Amino acid sequence: MVSPLIILLIIWLSVGAKSVEIASINHPCAYAHTVNITDGLRMKDGSYSYAGVVVPPHLMAEYSFKVIDGVEYRAKKHLRGCVCLLKPCISFCCPENLVFDAKHWNCTMPHQVRESTHVELTYANRTVDQVRIRDRFVVRTELGCRNKFVDKKHDNFWQWDLFENGTLRRDNRLWSTDEYCFSPLEHNPEQWELTPLNCERFQTGYRVWIYAICSIIAIIINIFILSLLGSVRDARKSHYGQLIIYYLLSMIVGYSLLVYLALKNPMKLSHVACRNIGFLAYFCIMLSFVFLAICSLDFLLKFKQKAVRSSVRRLSLALAVLAVIGLRFLVSLAQDSKLPKHFKPGMGEDYCWFDVRTWGILIYYYGPIALLLIFSIVCCLKAYFSIYELPPDTQYILGTQLKIVKTHFYAFSAYIVGVFAVWIREIVVYIMARVREHFFIIDFWSGICILGLAIAGFILLLGKNLHVKSWWAINVESSQTDLSIINARVYKFDEKGDLKSSDSPYKPTVTSL
């Protein structure tokens, strides 16, 4: 049977080889500065004439990909030239004589042809002038981005400045030429204006809400588990209970931040806040898996009857936290490096969390999680076989009843298997989506799986915890039993409504109104 670790390694190497192959091709300029010149006029010297601009051969190259939302996708090989380096470019959302339909999100033919020949241009000295578009810019019609932001109800949507180099200012932000496109829009009845539509990375809809609602319910369940484990002294003091508490605390904080990012438009967050929230969520979630791995190792050492001193245990926890902090800064360095975009996590760019359109999430997120879960599974398997190596008359193991340790171990192992299955599903779904180039920024099935794990945690981590069950039997069930005995003794009435018990301190009384 092929190890999942080997499969992940093969996938990672194939991805890396493909990305290096793409990055190694020498392109004369950035994709955002190019235009498809296949339909241009080829000159005798090998140059191309396109929209009145002569593109020399050294500024042309064949491209086997296209860029949408800043991410490369496979495409038929075509010729592109660095036209925008020779003359500023602006993008139109739709071909000539078509307009963008904000209701159906496509290009449609208007009832009356809307010619867009002029645009307001803002100069460096802040003066504004109406200029003929094709005199100042090369017009290109490309997708650029899948989702376009349209908000005709607010006045600031109609307020923007187009500069001489093709960049656009709106909402106190500069947008490059591949982050917006122009289209005529109806501002007032029968009054159309040429308006730029910015690329919208934030998505809403039923997927987001299903994910958010399921995650919030899961967080509430985990908070209940955490509070009950923390309130029971024996559970709180045991090594197993401590690690589960640390795990739940990290997971609650991490998923709470992810839900916040799912519901919050990144455009309404500063770059620093967006980036820091994403990295904090990453740190907490990775730390939760480290605690699961430590708990698995702790069970293995117990069944091997290898005692670990408290100082060593505290040191190992501190080193684990430091290792996750180091991993967090390693991912931050990768984000700020000059690596190809496919190797970057993408935090703080289009999204505050990982960009699922690149391979970075597999390298920095799914990869470490898979390694930690494989380590946990291996430790649990070794611990399981170590149980049968114990002497038959063993009652206690390192000062704890063997029955308690075994019960907790079986419940924890079942939970680990569930976590492993959920995350293998996550990785497989991501790889299939990445290969097909069909992405969902929010996968609502992830929220359903998170909720399922919370329910499993309630049953296995809380319901099967013998310390909690003992506390519940003493403090809750016994109290209810005593109360029911008292009630049964006090409130025994005969058919007439009088008390049956003659020794009851409560005597029937007659009250008149």
Curated annotation (Swiss-Prot):
Its main location: membrane. GO terms for molecular function: G protein-coupled peptide receptor activity; G protein-coupled receptor activity. Keywords: Cell membrane, Disulfide bond, G-protein coupled receptor, Glycoprotein, Membrane, Receptor, Signal, Transducer, Transmembrane, Transmembrane helix. Glycans are attached at N36, N106, N125, N165. One of its GO terms (cellular component) is plasma membrane. Disulfide bonds join C29-C82, C84-C89, C93-C181, C94-C107. It holds the Pfam family Methuselah_N. The chain crosses the membrane at residues 208-228, 243-263, 277-297, 315-335, 361-381, 404-424, 439-459. It comes from the Eukaryota. InterPro entries: Methusela_ecto_dom_1, Methusela_ecto_dom_2, Methuselah_N_dom, Methuselah_N_sf, Mth_GPCR. Residues 229-242, 298-314, 382-403, 460-513 are cytoplasmic. One of its GO terms (biological process) is determination of adult lifespan. Residues 1-19 form the signal peptide. Residues 20-207, 264-276, 336-360, 425-438 are extracellular. It is a multi-pass membrane protein. It is found in: Cell membrane. Belongs to the G-protein coupled receptor 2 family. Mth subfamily. This is Probable G-protein coupled receptor Mth-like 9. It comes from Drosophila melanogaster.
